């Protein structure tokens, strides 16, 4: 059970990293992404830091605000996880 929890924590950390990287590459502030996605800025900040576990719908809204498909966001997250596991 501990390994499963650990992997979930890593998943959420990677998700946050991927969101933050994409947001910064687009030149958006958290406030601007918040407005574009409809997700509260403080919640978005917590997601980016891997401190909150967003629902499927919230992740889809964030992906939309980042002008990317949900599947691409998840794919990028999986790549992040694989890179962390390899190191």
Regions found by a protein language model. Give the residues of each.
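Recognition helix of helix-turn-helix/homeodomain-like DNA-binding domains
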Residues: 38-52
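Short basic helix-loop element that most often maps to the first helix and adjoining turn
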Residues: 17-36, 61
